[in-house]
Amino acid sequence: MATKVTIQDIANELQLSRNTVSKAINNTGVLADATREKILRKAAEMGYKQFAYLPLFQEDAAKAAEPFILPSGKREIAMLTTQFLSSSHFSSTMLDRFQSEINHLHSGMTIHRISPIELKEKKLPSSLNIQRTAGIICFEVFDYDYAQMLCDLDLPLLFVDSPVMNMRPPLKADRLYMENRIEIQNAVTHMVQRGKKRISFAGDKNHCQSFFERYMAYRDAVEHFGLTEGLSTCAMPSGQQNYPVSLYETIRRFKTMPDAFVCANDFVAMDLVKALDELGYSVPDDIWVCGFDDSQEASYFAPRLTSIHIHGQIMGYTAANLLMTRIEEPSLNYRTVYTETNLILRESTGD
C-alpha cells in the first residue's frame, strides 16, 4: 500500500513551512500567486489527496515548471551592505542559501560595500554597474534616506531588515525580517515564571526595524505582566562608536540593577555580560541575560548564552524567492515577510 502523502511531506520537498503549504492547499491566508501555484503543482505531482485545485494541475503536473531565466547581460544580483559581514552574522548561512538558489537561475551575486562617504552623499558604490544589475538585496542598510534613494532607482529591491519604519512613509521595496516579537515575549514569560520581576532591555532600539520590534515586544510583555519597574533601567545607548564602553557607562550609573536583561542581539548581550562582570555581577547568579540571533559565539561564550535562533537557510530561500519573483513580476504589491525564530535556553538564564 502506497504511503500517504502529507502536508509536511510537501513542505519538506519545497523547503517551506507547513503553515504556508496548508494555506495554499486550503486556499486560506495571503500567498504570492507564484508560491501558491508551486505548492499546488508539487501536491499534484506527489499524489496528495484530492482537493479543489487538483484538476487544474493534473494535466501538467509531470512537467517541471520552467524556471525564470534572467536576460543575458543583466544577470547580476547586487548585494549592498554598510558593514563587513563576518561568519558570526546571521547573514552568513542565509547568503549561502541565497546564492545557491539564484545560481539555479543562471544568476550571480556581486558584493558592494557602501562607504561612509557614499552613505552620507547618497551615492551608489563605485563598483556597482547598474546596467548589468537585475536586482538588489540590502544588508545592514539602516539609513532611511539612503534606503529611499535606492527605492528611487526603480530596480527590484529587497531589504533584509530595514531602517526603523515607525511613523515614516513605507519603502517602495520588499522587506524580509526574522520574527522579532513572539520569542522575545516568550523569553520574558520564562523569566517571569521563574520569579524575575525587574526585567530590562539592552540595545539601541532605533538602530534598525528589528531592534525596534524587539524592544516593543519586550515592553508589551512587561506591561502585560504589570512589571514596568525595569523600564527605568533599560540600557539603550545610541550609536556604534565604542559601544561596549557606552554600555558599561550606562549600567554603571544604575542605582538598582534589574533581575534580568533582554538584549537586542547576542553581541549586545556579550558586551553586557562583560560589563556586569567588571561591576561585580555574575550571570546568571545575580542577573539573567538573553540575546538574539543565536550566533556561533552564543553556544561557547561563558556563560553559554540564552538566545533566539534565526533560521538562516529559510531566510536565504525566502530572500531568493522574494527578489526573483519581483524581477519576474515588477508590478506585484510590495511584500513584508517574517520567518520563524525559536527561543534557545542556556546557562545565562539559569538553564
Predicted regions and their residues:
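N-terminal helix-turn-helix DNA-binding module of bacterial transcription factors
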Residues: 1-65
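Short, solvent-exposed amphipathic alpha-helices that sit
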Residues: 89-105, 183-186, 209-229, 271, ...
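Short beta-strand elements in bilobed, periplasmic/extracellular small-molecule ligand-binding domains
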Residues: 102-115, 201, 219-244
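Hydrophobic alpha-helical segments within soluble ligand-binding/sensing domains
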Residues: 174-202, 241-249, 269, 310-328
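An alpha-beta-alpha
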Residues: 185-227, 335-350
